C-alpha cells in the first residue's frame, strides 16, 4: 500500500510540474508583450493553481469556436461590401491636415478605405441632452434603428428611451438592440427585455456569461461599444452607456458619471453601420450589411463637413489599430496634446510616446477622475504618475464626479472620440470604437469641453506627489507590476 501511495504522490507531483511547464511554454511561445508575459509567469509561480486556472480562463483571446467561424465566414461578403463602397467616390476625403495626415494614411492602408467627408457633428455633454436628442431621432425614424451598448441600466430617462424605441417598433420601424451580457445584467434580469421583444424589437444578449464554458471562451472579453444608427444616416457614439447618471452606481462614492457623446449626420453612419453588422453577424449568424450612402440625403458635401475615420477593434477588424492610432496621434503633436480617460493603464509604448511628446516641448495634459470606481485600476494608474510628472506632463484630477469621457485632442485639429479607455482592456481586448476627426471646428468644440473639465479639476503638484506615504508607493508598485493584466 505504501508503494501505491508513493507512486500516486510522484505522479501527482510530476503532473503538477508538467502542467506548470506546459503553461509556461505556452506563455513564452505566444506573441505578447514582455511585461504581460512576466506578470503571468509571476502569478503562476507564486500561486500555481490559481495562476494556471486564471490563465486558462482569461489569459488568451478566445472568442469561442462558433463566433470565430462566423467571423471567418463573414469576411468575403464584408470585403465585397467595402469594395462596392469605394465606388461612392464622392464621400471620401482626398486631403487631410498636416497633423492628421499620417493617422488617416495609417487607417486607410489598414482598413482599405479613406476617411469619409461631408458629416455634421454635434458634441453632447449632458446626459439629458443626449437622451432627449436620441428620443427625438427615434420618433422621426422612418426605416431602421440599430443600437449597441455595454450597459443598459433601467431607470430614469433610460426608460423613456426604451419606451420610444418600443413605440418605433410598433409602428413598423425595424429595431435591433445588442447589449453586453455582463454589463447589462440588470437589464436582462428586468422586465424590459421581454417587453421590448414583445414590441417587436430584436434584442440580443452579446457574449453571454456562461461559467460552464469558462475554458472555451474568455469571460472578460466584452462588447464595449456604444453606438446608435438611425436610417443609415444619423449616428451616435461616445463614452455614455444607456444609463441615467442620477440612478447609476449611486453607492459607489464617486459621484455622477460625466460623459461625452457625438451626434452625427452623414456617411459616417454607413461606416459605423458595417461595424454593427459585423458584430450582429458574429453574435447571431444573420447578415445585415448596410446600404451605401444615399447621395440624395447628403446636403453637407462641402468644405464645412467634417472628415471622419471610424476605427473598430474586435473580430474582422485590423489587429492593434486603435493602439497604433493613439501612438501616431501622440507622435504627431507639435503644440499641445490633451487626453481624457477614466482608466489610465497605458502600454509601455504609449507611455513612452506621451513622455517623449512632453520632453520635446509639446504641452501635454491628462485629465483623470480623482475618484475611480475601480480600485485596482485606480492604484495602477497612480504608478505611472511619477514618470509622467518627471517628463513634464500635467495631470489633472477631475473633482466633479467620475469623468468617463474618452477623448484625445492634438493641436486643436485632430480629435479622437469614442469608447476607448487608455488601458490594456480597451487597447487589446474589448470590442471598441473610436472616431478620428480632422476638423478645426470640432477641435474647438472638444477643446471647450476639455477646458471645462480642467476648470473642475485639481492640478497634481509634483513636489507634493514625491512626498506621499511609503505605503502608497508600495501599493502602487504592486499594482503596477500586474497592470498588464488589468
Swiss-Prot record:
Pfam families: PLDc_2 (PF13091), PLDc_N (PF13396). CDD domains: PLDc_EcCLS_like_1, PLDc_EcCLS_like_2. Its EC number is 2.7.8.-. Catalyzes the reversible phosphatidyl group transfer from one phosphatidylglycerol molecule to another to form cardiolipin (CL) (diphosphatidylglycerol) and glycerol. One of its GO terms (biological process) is cardiolipin biosynthetic process. It catalyses: 2 a 1,2-diacyl-sn-glycero-3-phospho-(1'-sn-glycerol) = a cardiolipin + glycerol. GO terms for molecular function: cardiolipin synthase activity. Residues 219-246, 399-426 form the PLD phosphodiesterase domain. It is an enzyme of class 2 (transferase). It is found in: Cell inner membrane. Disulfide bonds: none annotated. SUPFAM superfamilies: Phospholipase D/nuclease. It comes from the Bacteria. One of its GO terms (cellular component) is plasma membrane. The chain crosses the membrane at residues 3-23, 38-58. The gene is clsA. This is Cardiolipin synthase A. Its main location: membrane. It is a multi-pass membrane protein.
Amino acid at each position: 500500500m505504501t508503494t501505491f501511495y508513493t507512486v500516486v504522490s510522484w505522479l501527482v507531483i510530476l503532473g503538477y510540474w508538467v502542467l506548470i511547464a506546459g503553461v509556461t511554454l505556452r506563455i513564452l511561445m505566444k506573441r505578447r508583450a514582455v511585461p504581460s508575459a512576466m506578470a503571468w509567469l509571476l502569478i503562476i509561480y507564486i500561486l500555481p493553481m490559481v495562476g494556471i486556472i486564471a490563465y486558462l480562463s482569461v489569459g488568451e483571446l478566445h472568442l469561442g469556436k462558433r463566433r470565430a467561424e462566423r467571423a471567418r465566414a463573414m469576411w468575403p461578403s464584408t470585403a465585397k461590401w467595402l469594395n462596392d463602397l469605394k465606388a461612392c467616390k464622392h464621400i471620401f476625403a482626398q486631403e487631410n491636415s498636416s497633423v492628421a495626415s499620417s493617422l488617416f494614411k495609417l487607417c486607410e492602408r489598414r482598413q482599405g478605405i479613406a476617411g469619409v467627408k461631408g458629416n455634421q457633428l454635434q458634441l453632447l455633454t449632458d446626459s439629458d441632452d443626449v437622451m432627449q436628442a436620441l428620443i427625438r431621432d427615434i420618433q422621426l425614424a422612418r426605416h431602421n434603428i440599430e443600437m449597441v451598448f455595454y450597459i443598459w441600466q433601467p431607470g430614469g430617462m433610460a426608460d423613456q428611451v426604451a419606451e420610444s424605441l418600443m413605440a418605433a417598433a410598433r409602428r413598423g420601424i425595424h429595431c435591433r438592440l445588442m447589449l453586453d451580457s455582463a454589463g447589462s445584467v440588470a437589464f436582462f434580469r428586468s422586465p424590459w427585455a421581454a417587453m421590448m421583444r414583445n414590441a417587436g424589437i430584436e434584442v440580443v444578449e452579446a457574449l453571454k456569461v456562461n461559467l460552464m464554458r469558462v475554458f472555451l471562451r474568455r469571460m472578460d472579453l466584452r462588447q464595449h461599444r456604444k453606438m446608435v444608427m438611425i436610417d443609415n444616416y444619423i449616428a451616435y457614439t461616445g463614452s455614455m452607456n444607456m444609463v441615467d447618471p442620477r440612478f447609476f452606481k449611486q453607492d459607489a462614492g464617486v459621484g455622477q458619471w460625466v460623459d461625452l457623446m457625438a451626434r452625427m449626420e452623414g456617411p459616417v453612419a454607413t461606416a459605423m453601420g458595417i461595424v454593427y453588422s459585423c458584430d450582429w453577424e458574429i453574435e447571431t449568424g444573420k447578415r445585415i450589411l448596410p446600404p451605401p450612402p444615399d447621395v440624395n440625403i447628403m446636403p453637407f458635401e462641402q468644405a464645412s463637413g467634417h472628415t471622419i475615420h471610424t476605427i473598430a477593434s474586435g473580430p474582422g477588424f485590423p489587429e492593434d489599430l486603435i493602439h497604433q492610432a493613439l501612438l501616431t496621434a501622440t507622435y504627431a503633436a507639435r503644440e499641445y496634446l490633451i487626453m481624457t480617460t477614466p482608466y489610465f493603464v497605458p502600454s509601455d509604448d504609449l507611455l513612452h510616446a506621451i513622455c517623449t511628446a512632453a520632453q520635446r516641448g509639446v504641452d501635454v495634459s491628462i485629465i483623470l477622475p480623482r475618484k475611480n470606481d475601480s480600485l485596482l485600476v485606480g492604484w495602477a494608474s497612480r504608478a505611472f504618475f511619477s514618470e509622467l510628472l518627471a517628463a513634464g506632463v500635467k495631470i489633472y484630477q477631475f473633482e466633479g464626479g467620475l469623468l468617463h469621457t474618452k477623448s484625445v485632442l492634438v493641436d486643436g485639429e485632430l480629435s479622437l472620440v469614442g469608447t476607448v479607455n487608455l488601458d490594456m482592456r480597451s487597447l487589446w481586448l474589448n470590442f471598441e470604437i473610436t472616431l478620428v476627426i480632422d476638423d478645426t471646428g470640432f477641435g474647438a468644440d472638444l477643446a471647450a469641453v476639455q477646458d471645462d473639465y480642467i476648470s473642475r479639476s485639481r492640478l497634481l503638484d509634483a513636489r507634493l506627489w514625491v512626498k506621499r506615504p511609503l505605503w502608497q508607493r508600495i501599493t502602487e508598485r504592486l499594482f503596477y507590476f500586474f497592470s498588464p493584466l488589468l
